[in-house]
Regions:
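Glycine-enriched alpha-helix->loop->beta-strand junction motifs that scaffold or abut catalytic
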Residues: 11, 31-37, 63-67
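Aromatic-lined glycan-binding groove of carbohydrate-active enzymes
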Residues: 54-76
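Short, small-residue-biased leader/transition segments that mark boundaries at the very start
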Residues: 2-5
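Mid-to-C-terminal alpha-helical segments outside catalytic/metal-binding sites
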Residues: 122-171
Length: 171
C-alpha cells in the first residue's frame, strides 16, 4: 500500500518485490519514491515460474532504477531435472536480463538459505565458479563488480538519500 511504501522509504528500508503478486509489485513500484529490488527472482521468459519476473516486470524495475538479482535456485532457472540445473542455466538468466534491462539493473543471489544451489555453485565454497563463468561469458571486471553487489549498493545508497530528504521535509 501507499502508506507502507511511504513508511519504508521514510526509514530508508529497501523494498523487495520478490514474492508479491504482479499487481502488488506494480503498485509498490508506482508508490515508491526510491528504487526497489527483487532479491531473488529470475527471468520468466526462460523459466515460467510464478516467482520469476516477466519482461514487463523487469522493465518496471529498470524504469524505477532498481535491481533484479537472479538466483541460483534450480527451480527458478529450469524445469529440467536431468541433468540438474547448472552454471550455464544461471548464466543464461544473467545474460537474458542484462540484454533486456541492462547491466546496471541486474545482480546475483545464491538463495542458499532458501534451498538454492546448482551444479557448480552448491555453496559458498564454490562462489569463485560464478566469477569464472561470468568471465567466460565476456563480462568485464567492472560489470562483474556491478553484478556481485555494486548495483545493490547503488540502490541502497539511493534509498538512504531519499530517506534523508524525506526526513528533512524535502520530499
Amino acid at each position: 500500500s501507499d502508506v507502507c511504501s511511504s513508511d519504508l522509504n521514510y526509514y530508508g528500508i529497501m523494498i523487495d518485490i520478490s514474492h508479491p503478486s504482479k499487481e502488488a509489485i506494480k503498485q509498490m513500484i508506482e508508490l515508491s519514491k526510491a528504487p526497489v529490488i527483487a532479491s531473488h527472482s529470475s527471468a520468466r521468459a526462460l523459466r515460467d515460474h510464478p516467482r520469476n519476473l516477466d519482461d514487463e516486470q523487469l522493465n518496471w524495475v529498470k524504469e524505477n532504477g532498481g535491481v533484479v538479482q537472479t538466483t541460483a535456485l534450480g527451480a527458478f532457472l529450469t524445469d529440467r531435472k536431468d541433468p540438474p540445473p547448472n552454471m550455464d542455466d544461471f548464466m543464461d538468466h544473467i545474460d537474458y536480463m542484462v540484454g533486456k534491462i541492462g547491466i546496471d539493473h541486474v545482480g546475483i543471489s545464491s538463495d542458499f538459505d532458501g534451498g538454492g544451489g546448482i551444479v557448480g555453485w552448491k555453496d559458498a565454497s564454490e562462489t569463485m565458479n560464478v566469477t569464472a563463468a561470468l568471465k567466460e561469458r565476456g563480462y568485464s571486471e567492472s560489470e562483474i563488480e556491478k553484478l556481485w553487489g555494486g548495483n545493490l549498493l547503488r540502490v541502497l545508497d539511493q534509498v538512504q538519500e531519499i530517506a534523508a530528504k524525506m526526513q528533512a521535509g524535502e520530499l
